[in-house]
Amino acid sequence: MYNYPHKNYRPFSAICDCGFGRKIIYTRQRQITWRNIVDELNKALAIHRQNAAEIEYLDRYYRGDQPILYRKKVNRPEVNNKIVVNLAYELVERKTADICAEPIQYVLRGTDDKKSDEISWLNAIMDSENKQECDIDICRWRSICGTAYRFIGNDEGNGSVLDESDFELSSENPIYTFVVYFPNNKPAFSCQIREDENGQEFYFCYTNGQWFEISEGKLRRFGVNGNGAIPVIEYPNNSRRLSDIEMTIAITDAINTLSSDRINGIEQFVSSWVKFVNCEVDRDSFLSMRQEGALVVKSNNGTENKADVDVMTTELNQTEGQVVFNDLFERFLDIQGLANRASINSGGDTQGAVNLRNGHYDAGLRTAINEPILKKSENMSIKIILNRLRISKGFTLVPSDVEIHINHNKLDNMMVKAEVLQILLNCGIHYKRAIKVIDMFSDPEQVAIESKDRMESLYTDKAEKQEEPKIEKPVNKEVVEQ
């Protein structure tokens, strides 16, 4: 398998040659079969190797391996502090928490009771398969390197007791996984790089109808893909596969340099050089007097050239350094769309005013525009999962019945949400729709099922209570009189 032992001693722009974002791999073939899969794989690997090198760099950067650690100083090399302010880690964790702090839930479109039970069962199966843990890992990879992959594989039990599904979910390492696309952006085939027991590298590829095992440039095995779709689904961070880290990597490098130099300035001030003017002091005498905390010198050239001893001090202006740091950090937050937790609030601020000023509102919008990209990939996953459940469990759900619900903080404006729920119910809105609209619960479908009897007794449909109006047939009076 690919091994990248290189340390991040160079800036990222030198690794990617200023070609930011991962390259999308395309094929010109109209169809991928056993006849052309080996050639197309070799073409794709040439592009993927560059992507893999960039992904490895960004992953090491996220873990703290940043260029400042390899800085060399020519002037006073003994004073060379290397401080990593790992904003990349904070960035990735905050971006991941925005989406995956609560489990992604599936909600039913409509009010069919049978399908509602199936949706609840689907959410329970996803929970038993530890889907949230898989989602968190996928969102981390998206933020770190710009893309991520989910694999929906066969579950043969693997010794698990009371396994409820015949599939398993896993997050694939994007260094060893990629998807190749047709020119119309439809997936052509996927590739997973693996090693056998002898350490020999081989490639496992899927198309919509077949799977292939390739090693040493030859097709070893192939068969039918029973999923009817490629079980490796890409989860891009955006259309350009830009990672969150590389968007501001120059700023984070500059903050590391600034922080290190500020510590260097303090250390150089504390351990300043001693300057001797018109006097000579041997090494042993100097060391002895320094331990005592005093120096005694005398002039060697009479009164005209008096002897003097001074400490050479030039302190770095920490105030100006803090101004630069604050400016860089503000630019970092603005570009990434993160809220500033350091802002000072006044006593009369409302929650809405605080959210606007501190950037929480903008951060929410950034997350919202990223959700459709995530939902597109999630829809591809749910199609494969529902197809498998239709065969094994007799599910009647279709993808159009399922609404993907990404949960955020449920504690904001709870009083307002409760009031809106009451208003909607009083206006005659169906209780299932009202519960979904207010976004108060992480699993609105389960809440609707548990509250069904109570809701139907309190908010019975008014139309059911009213008697059907009697329709009188028009009578032709002239005919009657005749």
Model-derived regions: residue spans:
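Extended, helix-rich architectural segments
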Residues: 2-162, 465-466, 470-482
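Surface-exposed loop-to-helix/strand elements on domain peripheries
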Residues: 112-115, 299-416, 453
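Extended, regular secondary-structure scaffolds
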Residues: 136-139, 144, 149-241
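Short coil/turn segments at secondary-structure boundaries
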Residues: 137-139, 153, 266-273, 342-348, ...
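Extended, charged amphipathic alpha-helical segments
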Residues: 220-355
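Long amphipathic alpha-helical coiled-coil segments
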Residues: 383-398, 429-446
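Membrane-proximal bilayer-interacting regions
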Residues: 404-406, 411, 417-438
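Long, highly charged low-complexity segments enriched in Glu/Asp and Lys/Arg with interspersed Ser/Thr
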Residues: 438-469
